[in-house]
């Protein structure tokens, strides 16, 4: 049981770090024809990330930014609650609070990435048709899966 909780803790920390990276880095869409990428915050061309997004004032990208920041916040809160419950909870109880907080993180990731996918993943406004998703987009979907698994495992596990 201790090994399972330690492994879950490590995966939770890795998920939080991946959420930070995927939200901060500007590689959500990558152009095939040039050294250019688009993130949640800026356009990057030739390694220079000074360009602002052409759609930066749209409500959809602001919603994606907000939900990704909320997912990071809920992931960290869930981690802190898990550590707190680990040392204060009585034996036999379940980690309901940390599990439900992690599932809220999962929901925020789902909403944020779904909005981005619908509005910008295949949009002609990013680049022309010769572009593909960057590692941040893929990393966010991986975090989506991990946060769901972690949330469910927190809900199922009992402290022994």
UniProtKB/Swiss-Prot annotation:
Membrane topology label: Multi-pass membrane protein
UniProt KW Glycoprotein keyword: yes
Superkingdom of this protein's organism: Eukaryota
GO cellular component assignments: plasma membrane
Keywords from the UniProt entry: Glycoprotein, Membrane, Transmembrane, Transmembrane helix
Gene3D superfamilies: 1.20.140.150
Classification via Pfam families: PMP22_Claudin
Positions of transmembrane segments: 1-21, 67-87, 95-115, 137-157
Compartmental location: Membrane
Principal place of residence: membrane
Residues of this chain annotated as glycosylated in UniProt: 35, 43, 128
Gene Ontology biological-process entries: apoptotic process; bleb assembly
Similarity comment text for this entry: Belongs to the PMP-22/EMP/MP20 family.
Protein name per Swiss-Prot or TrEMBL: Epithelial membrane protein 1
Taxonomic source organism: Mus musculus (Mouse)
Lineage: Eukaryota, Metazoa, Chordata, Craniata, Vertebrata
Gene assigned in the entry: Emp1
